[in-house]
Amino acid sequence: MVKPKYQRVVLKLSGEALAGEDGFGIKPPVIKEIVQEIKEVHELGIEMAIVVGGGNIWRGQIGAQMGMERAQADYMGMLATVMNALALQDTLENLGVPTRVQTSIEMRQIAEPYIRRRAERHLEKGRVVIFAGGTGNPYFSTDTTAALRAAEVDADVILMAKNNVDGVYSADPRVDETATKFEELTHLDVISKGLQVMDSTASSLSMDNDIPLVVFNLNEAGNIRRAILGENIGTTVRGK
């Protein structure tokens, strides 16, 4: 059996990934497909944490554009990520995968508060840890949350799962036929070229902490496992 390239990973899932083709709401059959792949990876002995977005329910930026106070709109987005985290937890545990949800905003009746050392112990014990609530602060994206949590738990890599996009391109391949795919980049390349991989705060944090990123197509079955095994899929963004 091929030895995995990465042992402790942070998987970044967008909220839209849980919504399927509709792009809105939570679709249990779609979640089950994703979770089945996570289970296969878990059975390899991989320590996995998940950061999930909330864009399938609410986006703080859009709320702000419609006249809401930005901080208030962002807090609503953080609560949306908790709903997604609970949906993931329910499906994972139904498939026999031990799971803990940790939130950056305390809501003890439904999840643990985020405590770094406790999160690390859960990972060591083979539990999948789902980080919800973003960073707990407005104005920060869940991409930044992924970079922050990856640094805090000393993850080997961030797996950036994209919907129907198989890597990083010079432009959006869905609208620009001349867009070219990058096989490998650095976080500095991403920032200097203005590539839409993750926001600049997340890229800077990943660069400063030398955390690599693998950007791949979530919609192709088996890609989470392939990324962890180190197969040549998507785009690898090196830490330095």
Curated annotation (Swiss-Prot):
It is found in: Cytoplasm. The keyword Nucleotide-binding applies. It comes from Enterococcus faecalis (strain ATCC 700802 / V583). It catalyses: UMP + ATP = UDP + ADP. It is an enzyme of class 2 (transferase). The gene is pyrH. This is Uridylate kinase. Allosterically activated by GTP. Probably inhibited by UTP. InterPro entries: AceGlu_kinase-like_sf (IPR036393), Asp/Glu/Uridylate_kinase (IPR001048), Uridylate_kinase (IPR011817), Uridylate_kinase_bac (IPR015963). Its main location: cytoplasm. Belongs to the UMP kinase family. Its EC number is 2.7.4.22. ATP binds at K12, L13, S14, G15, G55, R59, N163, Y169, D172. Homohexamer. Keywords: Allosteric enzyme, ATP-binding, Cytoplasm, Kinase, Nucleotide-binding, Pyrimidine biosynthesis, Transferase.
